[in-house]
UniProtKB/Swiss-Prot annotation:
<dbReference type="Pfam" id="PF00275">
    <property type="entry name" value="EPSP_synthase"/>
</dbReference>
<dbReference type="InterPro" id="IPR006264">
    <property type="entry name" value="EPSP_synthase"/>
</dbReference>
<dbReference type="GO" id="GO:0003866">
    <property type="term" value="F:3-phosphoshikimate 1-carboxyvinyltransferase activity"/>
</dbReference>
<keyword id="KW-0028">Amino-acid biosynthesis</keyword>
<comment type="subunit">
    <text>Monomer.</text>
</comment>
<dbReference type="GO" id="GO:0009423">
    <property type="term" value="P:chorismate biosynthetic process"/>
</dbReference>
<keyword id="KW-0808">Transferase</keyword>
<dbReference type="InterPro" id="IPR013792">
    <property type="entry name" value="RNA3'P_cycl/enolpyr_Trfase_a/b"/>
</dbReference>
<feature type="binding site">
    <location>
        <position position="22"/>
    </location>
    <ligand>
        <name>3-phosphoshikimate</name>
    </ligand>
</feature>
<feature type="binding site">
    <location>
        <position position="340"/>
    </location>
    <ligand>
        <name>3-phosphoshikimate</name>
    </ligand>
</feature>
<comment type="pathway">
    <text>Metabolic intermediate biosynthesis; chorismate biosynthesis; chorismate from D-erythrose 4-phosphate and phosphoenolpyruvate: step 6/7.</text>
</comment>
<comment type="similarity">
    <text>Belongs to the EPSP synthase family.</text>
</comment>
<feature type="binding site">
    <location>
        <position position="166"/>
    </location>
    <ligand>
        <name>3-phosphoshikimate</name>
    </ligand>
</feature>
<feature type="binding site">
    <location>
        <position position="313"/>
    </location>
    <ligand>
        <name>3-phosphoshikimate</name>
    </ligand>
</feature>
<keyword id="KW-0057">Aromatic amino acid biosynthesis</keyword>
<feature type="active site" description="Proton acceptor">
    <location>
        <position position="313"/>
    </location>
</feature>
<feature type="binding site">
    <location>
        <position position="164"/>
    </location>
    <ligand>
        <name>3-phosphoshikimate</name>
    </ligand>
</feature>
């Protein structure tokens, strides 16, 4: 895919940004904890979340879909499927399903694409094995494909050494099948969509005031079925916020955006860098929803070292902002970036250098000198949707060619359409 330099300002109101991926995954998987019809409007119709629907269908759920409205009727009991459960590119789907299936009687095989099958799963499989789960796979169950022989699990008191919503949710789901009350704690607060959704479903879960500790009781009855409208994804919206900031005389309003405090850290970083950006809350249900207004801005360099778990998906796009800011910027304490869909630290630095930017890898992040003269280049996405979309936005300033853009469809199927509607010229 080739993106040409955009010569005109952008002025738009965007209401059709992709639905939130995290909530879409959880809606589908958590529906299996109920016994009545679950309904979601604005479900994300991307490859990752459609794969999750296919997984729960193979476990016995009935699914009705009309456009982005999805209805799920859960099975009376989970079936042992006669096929591999394909998670595609989604670490969320795989890690949550490991936790869900570990305590369910049956035999299950989880696999994914070549990128997912090389991402670490021991952070889930190890603690589950310690409480009685039977999980088998390459490199001591660290790499998929993974085979799970579900059975009753022992209660646990687990302290996670990493701040990860995927680890947390997997352990919550396993706790529902344990033989007694379980506790979970983490070193810093990760995304809390699971807790929010499960509390709305009347799950037997208690959350500490600081959100760091959970008490989970085994399920004694089905949870309350869901009927929700899924808000738009702030991680997807971030690319167009960045576009408005870096393109002269531009302004964009984005509506119905999820504004959960654990999801807007990257926006706060942009504000600290000098971005003219406002977030307004319009609705508070089980999640906070609102709109974002942003316009062209001059950015200043910044050091980012806190709340990294809250901006891990936006880090590649933040690196683009760093490259266009005045002065030096850095991101540290972000070693988790090395085990995402790609090694995002190495890949961002490699590709920024190709575009004329002075960038340096750190063990746990990167350092970028802003204000360098950009040059048109061909970059490699390494199959990582967030790398591809970040450099697509940079391409609006300097022109860019991306070697694998199909990966964008895993999370944001209408990204190219929106970019084109804003005036971008794109060749395939």
């Amino acid at each position: 895919m080739k993106i040409y330099k955009l010569q005109t300002p952008v002025n738009a109101i965007l209401e059709n940004i992709a639905a939130d991926k995290s909530i879409s995954h959880r809606f589908a998987i958590f529906s299996l904890l109920t016994q009545e019809e679950n309904k979601a409007q604005n479900y994300l119709l991307a490859q990752d979340t459609l794969n999750t629907l296919e997984i729960i269908k193979n476990l016995g759920a009935k699914i009705e879909q009309k456009d982005s409205c999805v209805k799920i009727i859960p099975p009376k009991e989970i079936l042992s499927p006669n096929c591999i459960l394909d998670c595609g590119n989604s670490g969320t789907a795989m890690r949550l399903m490991i936790g869900f299936l570990a305590g369910i009687s049956g035999f299950f095989v989880l696999s994914g694409d070549k990128y997912l099958n090389n991402r670490p799963m021991r952070r889930i499989s190890k603690p589950l094995t310690q409480i009685g789960a039977r999980i088998y796979g390459r490199n001591e169950a660290n790499l998929a494909p993974l085979c799970i022989e579900g059975q009753k699990l022992k209660a646990f008191n687990f302290k996670s050494e990493i701040s990860s919503a995927q680890v947390k949710t997997a352990m919550i789901l396993s706790a529902f099948r344990a033989d007694n009350v379980c506790t979970f704690s983490e070193i810093s607060l990760s995304r809390n969509h699971s807790e929010n959704m499960l509390k709305a479903m009347k799950a037997p879960i208690r959350v500490s005031n600081d959100g760091l500790s959970l008490e989970i009781n085994p399920l004694k009855k089905p949870l309350k079925a869901q009927n929700i409208i899924i808000p738009n994804d702030p991680s997807s919206a971030f690319y167009f916020v960045l576009a408005a900031i870096i393109l002269p005389k531009s302004q964009i309003i984005l509506k119905n955006i999820l504004l959960n405090p654990t999801r807007i850290e990257a926006y706060k970083i942009l504000q600290k860098m000098g971005a003219k950006l406002e977030m307004t809350i319009t609705q508070n249900d089980f999640e906070t929803i609102g709109e974002i207004r942003v316009e062209s801005s001059k950015l200043n360099g910044i050091e980012v070292k806190d709340n990294i778990a809250w901006l891990i998906d936006e880090a590649p796009a933040l690196a683009i902002a760093f490259a266009l800011a005045k002065g030096k910027s850095s991101l540290i304490n972000a070693k988790e970036l090395r085990v995402k869909e790609s090694d995002r630290i190495a890949v961002m630095v490699e590709n920024l250098k190709l575009c004329g930017v002075e960038a340096r890898e750190l063990d746990d992040g990167f350092e970028i000198e802003g204000g360098c003269e950009l040059k048109s280049s061909k970059i490699k996405s390494y199959g990582d949707h967030r790398i591809a979309m970040s450099f697509a936005i940079l391409g609006l300033l300097c022109g860019i060619e991306i070697d694998d853009s199909d990966c964008i469809k895993t999370s944001f199927p209408n990204f190219i359409e929106i970019l084109s509607n804003l005036g971008a010229r794109i060749d395939y």
